[in-house]
Amino acid sequence: MAGQLREYRRRIKTVQSTKKITKAMELIAASRIAKARARVAASRPYAEEITRVISAVASQTTIAHPLTTERPEPTRAAVVVITSDRGLAGGYSSNALKRAGELVELLREEGKEPLLYAVGRKAGTYYRFRGRPLAGDYTGFSEQPSYSDAKAVADALITAFTTPTEEGGVDEIHLVFTEYVSAMTQNAVAHRLLPMVLREHDEPPAGGPLPNYEFEPSAEAVLDALLPRYVESRLYAALLESAASESAARQRAMKSATDNAEDLIKTYTRAANRARQDAITQEISEIVGGANALASGA
C-alpha cells in the first residue's frame, strides 16, 4: 500500500509540473492573440486599398502586365502552404496541409503540375518525410512575421511567375493559409494569388461619378511599381492571419491540456486518498488483530 501511495504522489507531482507548463503556454498564446488580431486588422485595409488602386490603374491602360495576364494553357502552378514552426497548436497545421492536399489534387486533375513552397517548419517536415520536392522552404517567423519575411517569399514567387515554364517557372500561384475568424474559429483556405484578378470597377463614392485618375509618370509605370507591392501585401496579410490563427489554436490546445491535467490530478488525488485510507485500515486491522491475539494468549 505504501508503495502504491508513493506512486500516486509521484504521478501527481509530474502532472502538476506539466500543468504549470501548459498553463504558461496558454497565457503566452492568449497574450499574443490580441497583438496578432490588431496586426491583422491593420493589414486588411492596406491590402484591400492596393487591390482597388491597381484595378483602377489597369482599367486606364491597354498594356497587359505579366502579373495580371492569364496564361492561355497553364501547365504548372505554385502552391504556397503556410503552417507553424512549432507544434502544440491542435489541428492548425494539419488542417492547412489537408487543404493544400485538396488543392494539389484539383490542380493535377486540371493538368497542372504543382510546385510546393513550404512556409513554416511543419510544412517542410511534412513534405520532406513524404519525399516531395520543395521549390522553397521558409522557417523561423510563423508566430511573428515581419514585412521583410513576406517580401523574401514574394520576391521568389514573382521570379518564378515571370520565368517561362520551360525554364522552371510557373503559370499560377496559389496561397494556402489559415484565415482568422475569431478566437474559436479559424478556417484553412486557398486563394489564387497570381495572375491577379482585377476588379471590374470601383463603386462610385456616395452615388457620384467614378473618379478620374491622373498618373505620373504613366499608368504603366505605376502598375509596375504597385503589382509587386500587391503580392507582398497579400502574402503579409496571409502570414498575419495565420499567426493569429496559430496563437488562437495553441491557446485552445493548451487550455484543453491544462483542463485535462486538472482532471488527472483530481483522479490521482482520489486514488491516493483511497490508497492512504486502505493503508490506515490495514494498519488498524493488524493492530486489532495483534491485540486480540495477545488477549487470547493471556
From Swiss-Prot:
This is ATP synthase gamma chain. GO terms for molecular function: ATP binding; proton-transporting ATP synthase activity, rotational mechanism. InterPro entries: ATP_synth_F1_ATPase_gsu (IPR035968), ATP_synth_F1_gsu (IPR000131), ATP_synth_F1_gsu_CS (IPR023632). Produces ATP from ADP in the presence of a proton gradient across the membrane. The gamma chain is believed to be important in regulating ATPase activity and the flow of protons through the CF(0) complex. The lineage of its organism: Bacteria, Bacillati, Actinomycetota, Actinomycetes, Frankiales. It is found in: Cell membrane. One of its GO terms (cellular component) is plasma membrane. Pfam families: ATP-synt. GO terms for biological process: proton motive force-driven plasma membrane ATP synthesis. Signal peptide: none annotated. Belongs to the ATPase gamma chain family. It is a peripheral membrane protein. Keywords: ATP synthesis, Cell membrane, CF(1), Hydrogen ion transport, Ion transport, Membrane, Transport. Its main location: membrane. F-type ATPases have 2 components, CF(1) - the catalytic core - and CF(0) - the membrane proton channel. CF(1) has five subunits: alpha(3), beta(3), gamma(1), delta(1), epsilon(1). CF(0) has three main subunits: a, b and c. SUPFAM superfamilies: ATP synthase (F1-ATPase), gamma subunit. It comes from Parafrankia sp. (strain EAN1pec). The keyword Zinc does not apply. Coiled coil: none annotated.
